[in-house]
């Protein structure tokens, strides 16, 4: 979601984002993304690789959401393999991030209605591009990293899916 992109931009300003194609259909978003130097994923990763490598050499990090879209039900979707392909092709490490709560406070069904709640990001250990413990191919790495993120997401769920989280507190009060 665009809330994820905004939060990541606050963490590290030298970031280039590969976004889903649908975001570019909204004129305001498209203008902002183009101005920021972001890329739509429909350009194809082979076409983007030289531009991305140039930006990485200038100190930028590449941000890709491998699910490609948000989930309707908070379950982590299958990962597309483009991020892992780029990691292998451009020799870039992967920094997996588990995000909990963004889909609750800004659900896919109510795209522009921000609800109160807690959003947390957990950065997992960096994976070197040549680390084969997650798989020999980028396809295998995609599946292994997805499992790693699901495990972390589940632990974040255990920690934050309580009445102390404003999102759940509001739901609890609303239901009684």
How should each PLM-predicted stretch be described?
Residues 10, 46-176:
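Non-catalytic C-terminal accessory region of glycerolipid acyltransferases
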């Amino acid at each position: 979601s665009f809330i994820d992109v905004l939060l990541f931009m606050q963490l590290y300003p030298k970031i280039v984002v590969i976004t889903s194609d649908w975001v570019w259909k909204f004129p305001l978003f498209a203008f902002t993304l183009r101005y920021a130097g972001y890329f739509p994923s429909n350009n194809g990763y082979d076409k983007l690789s030289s531009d991305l490598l140039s930006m990485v050499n200038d100190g930028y990090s590449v941000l890709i959401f491998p699910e490609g879209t948000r989930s309707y039900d908070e379950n982590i979707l299958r990962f597309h393999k483009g991020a892992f392909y780029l990691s292998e092709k451009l020799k870039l490490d992967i920094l997996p991030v588990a995000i909990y709560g963004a889909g609750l406070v800004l659900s896919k069904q109510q795209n522009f209605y921000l609800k109160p709640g807690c959003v947390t990001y957990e950065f997992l250990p960096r994976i070197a591009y040549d680390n084969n413990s997650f798989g020999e191919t980028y396809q295998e790495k995609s599946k292994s990293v997805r499992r790693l993120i699901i495990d972390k997401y589940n632990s974040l769920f255990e920690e934050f899916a309580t009445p102390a989280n404003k999102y759940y507190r509001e739901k609890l009060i609303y239901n009684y």
